[in-house]
Amino acid sequence: MVYPEEPFWVLPTVTGFYEDRDYRVNVVEALQEFWQMKQSRGAELKNGALVIYESIPSNSQPYICFVTLPGGSCFGSFQNCPTKAEARRSSAKIALMNSVFNEHPSRRISDEFIQKAVQDARTSFKGTSQINEGTESGIGAFRFMLEANKGRTMLEFQELMTVFQLLHWNGSLKAMRERHCSRQEVVAHYSNRSLDDEMRSQMALDWIAREHDNPGVIRRELVLAERELETFRMAGRELRFPKEKKDILMIAHNQLGGSALNSATIDD
C-alpha cells in the first residue's frame, strides 16, 4: 500500500517551539489534559484518552522516550536528552504540538483531502518500475479507507492507517487479495481490531517463516526499520509504522533465540 508524503503527515516547523528556554508549560500534563478534553467533547476514542509513554532501557544518555496518543499516532523525543524525565518532556512536546495542529480543518478527512492524498500517492510511483497491479490495488484500498473515515482527523485515523501499512509490508494484503477478499471485507474486519500483542505475534510468525526460507531477512529488515525509526524520531515526525516494524521483527528475532541485536546494528 502506498501513502502520500508531505503535507499530510509532516508538521510544519514553528519557530521557537523546540527551544527549552523560558518554556514553562508542563507539557506532559498539558498533553494528557488535551486528549481528556477532546474525549469530554465527544471525540470517538475507542481506547480512551490515556496517553502512553515508553522509555527505552538505557544506563546512559541520551535517553529516548516514545509517546503514543489515543488515536494511535506515535512520536519520540527529538533532542539529545540527558535524563529520562527530559526525554519524556521532549516526546510530549512534539506530540502536543501535533495534537494542537491536528485540530486545523485541513487535517480533517474530506472529499478534497482524499482526492489530493490519492493523487499524491499515485504520483509518488509515477515513472517508476513499482507501478503494478499490487500498487494500484493498494491505492484503491487507501482511497476506500479514507472514504470510510470521512470526518475524522489524521491523528484519530492513525492506528487504522498503521495496521494497513503493516499488512502491506507483511504481505498479508497480497495474500488476502489472492483469496479474493474484497476491500470492504478487509477494511471492515481490521477497523474493529486493535494493533495489539496478538496482531504483532501473528505478524512475527510470518517473519519467522520467511527467515527459514531466506536466512538473514529479519536482520536486514530490522536494520532498515532502525534507520527509519531514528530518522523519523530526530526529525520530529510521526513514527508509529517504523516503530511497530521494529517491535514485530524483534519479537520474531527473540522467538528464534538469536543473538542480541541493538542500535549498533544500524551502522552495518
Curated annotation (Swiss-Prot):
It is found in: Apical cell membrane; Cytoplasm. Interacts with ft (via intracellular domain) and ds (via intracellular domain). Disruption phenotype: Viable and fertile. Wings are slightly shorter with a decreased distance between cross-veins. This is Protein limb expression 1 homolog. It is a peripheral membrane protein. Keywords: Cell membrane, Cytoplasm, Membrane. It comes from Drosophila melanogaster (Fruit fly). Its main location: membrane. GO terms for biological process: autophagosome maturation; imaginal disc-derived wing morphogenesis. Component of the Fat (ft) signaling pathway that functions in normal development of various organs such as the wing and leg. In developing imaginal disks, involved in regulating both the protein levels and apical localization of ft and ds. Involved in establishing planar cell polarity (PCP) along the anterior-posterior axis of the wing (the early Fz signaling event), probably by acting upstream of ds and ft to regulate Fz activity. GO terms for cellular component: apical plasma membrane; cytoplasm; cytosol; subapical complex. Belongs to the LIX1 family.
